[in-house]
Amino acid sequence: MAKELTFEQQARAKLLEGINKLAKAVKITAGPKGRNALIEKKYGAPLIVNDGVTIAREIELKDPVENMGAKLIAEAAISTNDIAGDGTTTATILTHEIVNKAIEAINNGTNPVNLRIGIENAAKLVSEYLTSVSKPIKSIDEITQVGAISSGSKFIGELIAKAMDIVGPSGVISIDDAKSFDTTLDTTDGLEFKGGYSSPYMVTDSEKMLSELANPKILVSLNKINTVKEILPLLEASVESSAPLLIVASDIAEDVVTALAINKLRGTLNVVSVKCAEFGEAQKNTLEDLAISVNTILVDSAAGIEFKDLELNKLGSAEKVIISKDKTTVINGACHKDVLAKYLNNLKAKSANLTSKYDKERITKRIANLSNGVAVIHVGGATEVAQKELKLRIEDALNSTKAAVEEGIVAGGGIALMNAIEVLKQVKESNPEIALGYEIVRSSLTAPARQIIENAGQNSSKIINNIINSKQLGYGYNAETNEFVNMINNGIIDPTKVTKTALEKACSVAALLITTEVAINDELKEEKPSLNHL
């Protein structure tokens, strides 16, 4: 197909148009008084969302160059969400602000390469500053605050904090649809391990890129699966029984993965294959733990167990399994309580005899993974639309809370980024074009707070100046109550990881975009006039 090429200022102008359109749609969701977006769905009712990354994923623009600009800024949001689980709106706002200012500078003759150096260096300094002021969180109240701020609901914050209290900070928390209007918390047996689906063609939810299996049969193998022939009897039995099949192995040959994916796409076989991402002894331990938790025999040549020794009724099972690209969560495995208790006691006895701190920690994690279970938040709603919207908010809040436990918290409402302005003011840079890159980032750090204030219907310039002139660390504006407060003391906080990732991804995408000199896309075909009216 022929290609269309758009160069230099014309290319940047069109890319910028796409960036501005997507950013305008996402920015309105920022803060406690952020607005909603209504998204048309191909089937069913439209989706009402207050979630930046969901909006970003849905936007497709008609003009191909504009669409490339929109996809680039969406990449900042999606990458932030993938790493930190939240912060997508902040990433979008920052990218939009930095790119607009940088392109204006380039159009006025500034060298984009030098500008890029300044932007990337500034991002590094601000990231280091955020790490230095990060405050670790430990108490249930602090965890509640993070969840409440992210979701805009104290109830959701309390629900997540309670779930974390039950399964531990690194425990497994799953989110599921409720069969009633109420949103509740439940705990069940289960575990999680590293390793996702072998092929994206195995996903059942293309929006979230997840695969979910209800009541699957589960094959667990320490042996590599080299050919389809090795497991063919089990595949045929799975088809005959209409039972979903989960295959977890130390390794799976590419030919096998391809064959399984093709049969999955054809609807012949409801199967997901997973390669355990651990190695060596850790991999063996993970597969042994999984086999116990789902009540099956581990295929292991060293122990004399081969694929031919297993029938479908000897495979394990679980109430539900959720598989992402990099992890697998097993909920309510069919393990016998007495067998699991004996297995855990053996692990504890083994741990007591170990002298290596590393080995002890590894067994402790295995015991916790097997015994803490899974906390399940069942999300209800008066309508399907309300349920979906609430589910998205809970997912964001859970991700934010996990990020806060991992790396601590900073002042929320965009204030931590504003506090970092002083760090960039102190930079002495002899190259004026690199210095301009620093200045662009510095002047963009007020953008998230400004947007939150504007979404609350207030005069952002006046409030921003008040905050800057106060020169108090953590002093900011509570958009919910319309007053100036110490943000951390009043529970208005953001996870450090989320804020850092949003800034880093925004600067990274902006730096790539401003050094773009040509946009290449498929040539648009002219639409033939319709003859329907004749």
From Swiss-Prot:
Pfam families: Cpn60_TCP1
Predominant localisation class: cytoplasm
GO biological process, any: protein refolding
Record EC number: 5.6.1.7
Cited SUPFAM superfamilies: GroEL apical domain-like (SSF52029), GroEL equatorial domain-like (SSF48592), GroEL-intermediate domain like (SSF54849)
The UniProt record lists the keyword Hydrolase: no
A GO cellular component annotation in the UniProt record: cytoplasm
CDD domains: GroEL (cd03344)
Gene3D superfamilies: GroEL (3.50.7.10), GroEL-like equatorial domain (1.10.560.10), TCP-1-like chaperonin intermediate domain (3.30.260.10)
Reactions that this protein is recorded to catalyse: ATP + H2O + a folded polypeptide = ADP + phosphate + an unfolded polypeptide
Keyword field contains Isomerase: yes
Residues noted as binding ATP in the record, renumbered to the chain: T29, A30, G31, P32, D86, G87, T88, T89, T90, G413, D494
Segments crossing the lipid bilayer: none
Keywords of the record: ATP-binding, Chaperone, Cytoplasm, Isomerase, Nucleotide-binding
Domain of life: Bacteria
Cellular location(s): Cytoplasm
MF terms (GO), sorted A to Z: ATP binding; ATP-dependent protein folding chaperone; isomerase activity
Entry function: Together with its co-chaperonin GroES, plays an essential role in assisting protein folding. The GroEL-GroES system forms a nano-cage that allows encapsulation of the non-native substrate proteins and provides a physical environment optimized to promote and accelerate protein folding.
Subunit structure: Forms a cylinder of 14 subunits composed of two heptameric rings stacked back-to-back. Interacts with the co-chaperonin GroES.
Family statement: Belongs to the chaperonin (HSP60) family.
This protein's name: Chaperonin GroEL
Gene name of the encoded protein: groEL
